[in-house]
Amino acid sequence: MGSSSFLVLMVSLALVTLVVVEGVKGGIEKAGVCPADNVRCFKSNPPQCHTDQDCLGERKCCYLHCGFKCVIPVKKLEEGGNKDEDVSGPHPEPGWEAKSPGSSSTGCPQI
């Protein structure tokens, strides 16, 4: 095998390797966004997934509580929605308001 054939073979192998690695890392991203993670970790846990394709159903591969794992995503904000709105936590039912003992219907303490 001549040196030019060897060079063509090596370049071809390198290109195939890059394409395969990109395909494994990438994949199709599932709908939704990963939940917010406010946990501070001293050490990361081993990953349970690497891409969304590793997760069953609608679950996404997200970094949560010190490691990558398959979790149910939160829904994306609607077009034109408030970008500062927190979509990661539970939200009360419409009409619900916090009241403490001794407070008025406005939620302010009675004097």
From Swiss-Prot:
Gene3D superfamilies membership: Elafin-like
Originating gene: WFDC12
GO cellular component: extracellular region
Coiled coil location: none
SUPFAM superfamilies registered for this protein in UniProt: Elafin-like
Disulfide bonds: C34-C62, C41-C66, C49-C61, C55-C70
Protein name: WAP four-disulfide core domain protein 12
Compartments, record wording: Secreted
Domain WAP, chain residue ranges per copy: 27-74
Residue ranges, compositional bias (Polar residues): 101-111
Stretch list, region Disordered: 80-111
Keywords: Antibiotic, Antimicrobial, Disulfide bond, Protease inhibitor, Secreted, Serine protease inhibitor, Signal
GO molecular function list: serine-type endopeptidase inhibitor activity
Its biological purpose: Antibacterial protein. Putative acid-stable proteinase inhibitor.
